[in-house]
Amino acid sequence: MKAEVREMKRQFGEIRLFPETLDDLWHLSHLVGPGDLVFATTFRSVEAATDKLRPEKVEKRPVRLGIWVEKVEFHQHTNRLRIAGIIESGVDVAAHHTLNVEAGFEISVVKRWRPVDCERIRRAVDASAYGVVHVVSVEEGEAQIYRLRQFGPEWVTTVTAGSSKGADTGTRSALFEKTLDTVAAVTGPLVVAGPGFVKDEFAEYVKVRAPDLAGRMVAVETRRIGRGAVQEVIGQGILDRLLGDLHLAREVALMDEVLVRIATEGAVAYGIDEVRKAVAYGAAETVLVADTLLRDDEATGVIEQAERVNATVVVLSTEFEPGERLDAIGGAAALLRYKIE
C-alpha cells in the first residue's frame, strides 16, 4: 500500500491511501468504518439531457464523491472492498452510493486516526516493499503451496507427481520441475518446509535451476505437512529472520504467551472486562484485541485508554489461528507487568 498524509491536526485529518494488493484491501476494511468520510472518483448514473419528458438513456460518468460511510464489506474471493454510505459531496447529495474498491483504486479518508490505525498503515506500507511470502510444503509425491497474506495463510495450489509410495528419482524430479514452474514467478521470500530429506533435495534443485529465487529461499524442518507446516514455520520465527518483522509471527508468539500464562495462572487478563480493569490499574503491558471488536464502542474505549497509558496494542486477525484463539476467550487479552486480583 502507498499512503500520503494530506492534512492532520490532533490525530484528525485526511490520509490518501492507494491499495496495491488483496492484503491492502483487507487492511482498508479495518481502517475505514461507519462515520468516516471517504473521497474517491467513481462512476455514477447521469441522465442524458433531451427535449423529451423521459430521458432516452442513462449514462455512467466518472465523478468525485465524498461519502459518509455506513457499511464496509471485505470480499476476499472477488478481490474487492465495498464501502457503502450517503453522498456528502458531489452529485446527488444525500443519495446512497457504494464504492467498489479494488487494487489500484485510490481513496482519501477523513477521520480521527488512532495510533492502532497508523500502525496498521505502517505495516501495510512495509509489507508492499518486501513482497508476499510463499511457503512450499514438500513431501514424497506432493507439494502444497501457500501464500502468506496479512490476514493468514492462503492456499494457492497442490502439485502432484506419481505416488507417495515407492516414488523413484524420475518421479521426484518431475515433482520438483512442476513445483518450480509454479513458484518461478514469486518475487518475495520463499520458505521450503517439510519433514525428512525431500524438502532439502527440492531446495538444492532450486539453487541449481533458479539461483535468483534461491537467494530469497530458506529450507525449514517441520513435523507436519501442508497447512500444519505453515503454522510451524510461523511459530518457529523463521519469518522474523526473513523479513525482520512480519505481523503474523508476532501474533503467534503473543497468543502462545497468553495461553501459557492462563494455564499457569500468571500475569494475564482476558475478556474485555478484565482487560479494562488491567488497563485502568496501569498493569497492562501488551493488549491483544481481535479485529472483530474494532467496531465495538466498548472495545474501542479500552484500546484508547491502553494507548494513553503507553501499553502496546496489537490487533489479531480472526482469519488466522491466533486470532481465532483470542476470539474464543472473549476477543481481548492483556499481558501484564504484574498480577492483579
Swiss-Prot record:
Biological process according to GO: nonfunctional rRNA decay; nuclear-transcribed mRNA catabolic process, no-go decay; nuclear-transcribed mRNA catabolic process, non-stop decay; ribosome disassembly; RNA surveillance
Pfam families: eRF1_1, eRF1_3
UniProt cofactor(s): a divalent metal cation
Superkingdom field: Archaea
Keywords, comma-separated and alphabetical: Cytoplasm, Endonuclease, Hydrolase, Metal-binding, Nuclease
Compartment(s): Cytoplasm
Matching InterPro entries: eFR1_2_sf, eRF1_1_Pelota, eRF1_3, Pelota/DOM34_N, Pelota_arc, Ribosomal_eL30-like_sf, Transl-rel_pelota
GO molecular function: endonuclease activity; metal ion binding
EC numbers: 3.1.-.-
Keyword Cell membrane: no
GO CC, alphabetical: cytoplasm
Signal peptide: none
Keyword ATP-binding: no
Oligomer and partners: Monomer.
Record note on domains: The N-terminal domain has the RNA-binding Sm fold. It harbors the endoribonuclease activity.
Known role: May function in recognizing stalled ribosomes, interact with stem-loop structures in stalled mRNA molecules, and effect endonucleolytic cleavage of the mRNA. May play a role in the release non-functional ribosomes and degradation of damaged mRNAs. Has endoribonuclease activity.
The family this protein is said to belong to: Belongs to the eukaryotic release factor 1 family. Pelota subfamily.
Name of the protein this chain belongs to: Protein pelota homolog
Lineage, broadest ranks: Archaea, Methanobacteriati, Methanobacteriota, Stenosarchaea group, Methanomicrobia
Gene: pelA
